[in-house]
Amino acid sequence: MEFDAELDARQLACPLPILRAKKSLAQLTSGQVLKVIATDKGAPKDFEEFCRQTGNVLLSSTAQDGELVFLIRRR
């Protein structure tokens, strides 16, 4: 899937991946997609909750080569 911006949040512990994603999403316009790459094991649950609370859409959450990849569409 195509994305408009990418955030490398590898090696960052909670809550930094969420905080950086929030900042990155603020720079996008409605409908644009942010790709986040993280390694924090709690990130899937954190991003699910973050999107639920903010109204952004978690398009996908996958594991690739020991990394977690999230695609989030800005509301």
Language-model region placement:
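Intrinsically disordered, low-complexity regions of eukaryotic proteins
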Residues: E6-D8, G42, V69
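C-terminal structural segments of small proteins and small subunits
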Residues: E48-R75
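Intrinsic-disorder/low-complexity, polar/charged segments enriched in Ser/Thr/Lys/Arg/Asp/Glu/Gln
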Residues: D4, G31-K35, E67-V69
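Amphipathic, hydrophobic secondary-structure cores in small proteins
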Residues: L12-V57
